Amino acid sequence: MKALHFGAGNIGRGFIGKLLADANVELTFADVNQPLLDALNSRKSYTVRIVGDNTRLDTVSNVSAVHSGSQDAVALIAVADLVTTAVGPQILEKIAGTIAQGLVKRHNDGTTRPLNIIACENMVRGTSQLKQHVLKLLPEGHQEWVVEHVGFVDSAVDRIVPPSEAGSDDVLAVTVETFSEWIVDKTQFCGEPPAIPGMELTDNLMAFVERKLFTLNTGHAITAYLGQQARHQTIRDAILDPKVRAVVKGAMEESGAVLIKRYGFDADKHAAYINKILSRFENPHLHDDVERVGRQPLRKLSAGDRLIKPLLGTLEYHLPHDNLITGIAAAMHYRSEQDPQALELAELLRAQGPQAALAQISGLDADSEVVAQAVNVYNAMQ
């Protein structure tokens, strides 16, 4: 089986790429980082450090790499069985052109073997969004063929992969936690789903997408934002602060109550899932900076993301949300000179004030009780 994976960064190499290589898939990475591509092509392998109760080093072998915008990438799409991505939500639109060209070539070559495309991104139904970008770019006469011969398969992914530590002289080495979860929508495949250990099939993907978004992502973001407020450097430092931990756990319990109501998750099992995530945040081997985890606050405060979406669920089911509100207020205080969204957030708050700014970013009614609550907590944090 041949696969092309867009995104040779830490998540691509340490998570999806590793699972594919472990399944003996013939794997090529596509990226725009030329030094990374050169290193992959000269060495054909890299190491993954898996940290937890026991630390081990795995070697991923027999890999190659091409530039994301190259004709080599187009040619690979024309012959691949699987295309996966881990590029970040905002980059999906940028790789859609290469994918569209590859699908046109595949059609013109007369290939009828199924191709499945899976976006493995921190977003809800990312592959469906990628599909829309691709379909828009297809010339007339190709769309119908693509719909018939290509599966666009949504997924939920979960593995903490921090950036490479400063001072590491190996551009390809990557550190990941032991835990990983890759759940895909089995109803969207074209042909039979591939057998890849570590890839779980479900016909109820949204339950797992929201479970991850409302728990791991919600908790991670609030830990980062409260951690920065409390002057902590890392996620571990922040979650070991009892005040931060109480709010983070409380917020995950509030969002969890929405999941239990909406999808019928077992309350005891979900409580165990929350505790598992808290222990993952405490992992002493993962040096994950609160500033990194908190970046892109405008996206994280948008209506469909990890802070506002669970809050909307609590409003829908008339459930408590005080800790989620605290997390939202802390997100509004997030600052980073390196993050354009943080700079834009600060400017919005300066120009409009917290009430109008939060309403604009989140889509919440400026005159609603929850916005008033968030503004009160925000002001109290000054």
Curated annotation (Swiss-Prot):
<keyword id="KW-0520">NAD</keyword>
<dbReference type="InterPro" id="IPR036291">
    <property type="entry name" value="NAD(P)-bd_dom_sf"/>
</dbReference>
<dbReference type="InterPro" id="IPR013131">
    <property type="entry name" value="Mannitol_DH_N"/>
</dbReference>
<dbReference type="InterPro" id="IPR023027">
    <property type="entry name" value="Mannitol_DH_CS"/>
</dbReference>
<comment type="similarity">
    <text>Belongs to the mannitol dehydrogenase family.</text>
</comment>
<dbReference type="Pfam" id="PF01232">
    <property type="entry name" value="Mannitol_dh"/>
</dbReference>
<dbReference type="GO" id="GO:0019592">
    <property type="term" value="P:mannitol catabolic process"/>
</dbReference>
<dbReference type="GO" id="GO:0005829">
    <property type="term" value="C:cytosol"/>
</dbReference>
<dbReference type="InterPro" id="IPR013118">
    <property type="entry name" value="Mannitol_DH_C"/>
</dbReference>
<dbReference type="InterPro" id="IPR023028">
    <property type="entry name" value="Mannitol_1_phos_5_DH"/>
</dbReference>
<keyword id="KW-0560">Oxidoreductase</keyword>
<dbReference type="GO" id="GO:0008926">
    <property type="term" value="F:mannitol-1-phosphate 5-dehydrogenase activity"/>
</dbReference>
<protein>
    <recommendedName>
        <fullName>Mannitol-1-phosphate 5-dehydrogenase</fullName>
        <ecNumber>1.1.1.17</ecNumber>
    </recommendedName>
</protein>
<dbReference type="Pfam" id="PF08125">
    <property type="entry name" value="Mannitol_dh_C"/>
</dbReference>
<dbReference type="InterPro" id="IPR000669">
    <property type="entry name" value="Mannitol_DH"/>
</dbReference>
<feature type="binding site">
    <location>
        <begin position="3"/>
        <end position="14"/>
    </location>
    <ligand>
        <name>NAD(+)</name>
    </ligand>
</feature>
<dbReference type="InterPro" id="IPR008927">
    <property type="entry name" value="6-PGluconate_DH-like_C_sf"/>
</dbReference>
<dbReference type="InterPro" id="IPR013328">
    <property type="entry name" value="6PGD_dom2"/>
</dbReference>
